[in-house]
């Protein structure tokens, strides 16, 4: 695979939305990653293979050259500091937004512009701290790895910062969105050394994927 391209991506929504993009570029996975237990999956193109890893690990694999190219959400890229990657293409998949949410009863009498200090549960402490610091709001951040909506319900935190798509999960747990932080989508990222050593192949891949991206 020294002259081929290794692409890192994660299971779930991003994978399902990325497969048609690759198919449109003439690259088909040889196996269904959702069904297979394999972590390295070949494609119908002998010069391309896929690594199926955790979403949060994609930037690390690409940064260190274990993968030449990867697909990662903008939330993951912003949360991890010090990444030395090219980010040539917004694939416009995995679209959602990052927001602050709180119990509906609290939101009825709340005014985000008046916040001076907040206690937030999130799996995005870096983004959260930076966002509130830019507004002059002091933060007490509790890092969680899942089920953010539970934190305000049991008194662990007053509010949460999380990704919101349909808003259904918030609603079912009695929470409402009170402030949007930023829009989120998945990006194509490229290892800097690979961009030099495999420029022709990677630039071809970028053009092929770009042609599949919905305007």
Swiss-Prot record:
One GO MF term: ATP binding
Family annotation (InterPro entries): ATP_PRibTrfase_cat, ATP_PRibTrfase_CS, ATP_PRibTrfase_HisG, ATP_PRibTrfase_HisG_short
Catalytic activities: 1-(5-phospho-beta-D-ribosyl)-ATP + diphosphate = 5-phospho-alpha-D-ribose 1-diphosphate + ATP
Record keywords: Amino-acid biosynthesis, ATP-binding, Cytoplasm, Glycosyltransferase, Histidine biosynthesis, Nucleotide-binding, Transferase
EC number, UniProt record: 2.4.2.17
Matching PROSITE patterns: ATP_P_PHORIBOSYLTR
A biological process from GO: L-histidine biosynthetic process
GO cellular component: cytoplasm
Main localization of the protein described in the UniProt heading: cytoplasm
Pathway linked to the protein: Amino-acid biosynthesis; L-histidine biosynthesis; L-histidine from 5-phospho-alpha-D-ribose 1-diphosphate: step 1/9
Keyword Cytoplasm in annotation: yes
Compartments, record wording: Cytoplasm
Family: Belongs to the ATP phosphoribosyltransferase family. Short subfamily.
Role, per record: Catalyzes the condensation of ATP and 5-phosphoribose 1-diphosphate to form N'-(5'-phosphoribosyl)-ATP (PR-ATP). Has a crucial role in the pathway because the rate of histidine biosynthesis seems to be controlled primarily by regulation of HisG enzymatic activity.
Binding partners and assembly: Heteromultimer composed of HisG and HisZ subunits.
Domain characteristics, as noted in the entry: Lacks the C-terminal regulatory region which is replaced by HisZ.
Name recorded for this polypeptide: ATP phosphoribosyltransferase
Species whose genome carries this gene: Acidithiobacillus ferrooxidans (strain ATCC 23270 / DSM 14882 / CIP 104768 / NCIMB 8455) (Ferrobacillus ferrooxidans (strain ATCC 23270))
